[in-house]
Amino acid sequence: MVKVKKLFKTYGGKPVLKELDFEVEEGERVYILAPNGFGKTTFLKVLANIEPFQKGEIEVFGIKSPSHKIRVMISYISERDNLYPGFRIIDILRFISGFWEIDRSKFENFLFLLKINPLKRYSEFSKGERTLIRVALGLSIKAKIYLIDEPLSSLDFVLREKVVKLLGEMGGGTFILTSHEIDELLPFANRFVFLKDGKFFLETRDREKVKDIYREVFA
């Protein structure tokens, strides 16, 4: 489904991803773990065809990157607050619908669960609420793969639980998530990989070992 071979990527002249290999099968929920600044966001942006790469190969459903066909297969949910502050939520939905197919009933259900008024402007919501809106929008895209960058970062306990609830509503699907900490999404994932020195250093499917491995790898 996703195959990455010998991926090399520089950022600001500095190597960030170095001869990185990675594969994901359909239905996997992969959690990429590493401290901040280790290349997690860069890797997701390269996969999503947002950032270019210098060397290596990326293939998604048999299509080689870069390709617009890959971009529309993927829903990339950024940690950055990158939506349009003056737009109402319903207007943002209409805009995004011009690029991706949206499951409107799913989005409406998410807004109901979150108690978000779609007629309010994006700028009227708190920082944490805006994160919830971005996650809800991204998960409402009819994508083959969901790339979610640090979905719980800077959220309080109540909002973290809401993100977990949204993901729980998804049922099936293929997900690649990132985090710099072991958090509430640990039960959601079924595969855990550790990014260090520009490569995936180690991986496990055993949730019980994740905290110990993280401490060992990044001590």
Task: Indicate residue ranges for each PLM-predicted region.
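Conserved ABC nucleotide-binding domain
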Residues: 107-125
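Helix-to-loop junction immediately C-terminal to a conserved catalytic motif
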Residues: 48
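Conserved beta-strand-loop-alpha-helix hinge in the C-terminal portion
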Residues: 199-219
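The feature captures the beta-strand-to-loop junction immediately N-terminal to the Walker
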Residues: 33-35
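Conserved structural motif at the start of ABC-family nucleotide-binding domains
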Residues: 2, 17-19
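Catalytic Walker B motif of ABC-type/P-loop ATPase nucleotide-binding domains
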Residues: 146-150
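H-loop/switch region of ABC-family ATPase nucleotide-binding domains
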Residues: 178-180
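Conserved ABC transporter NBD signature motif
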Residues: 55-70
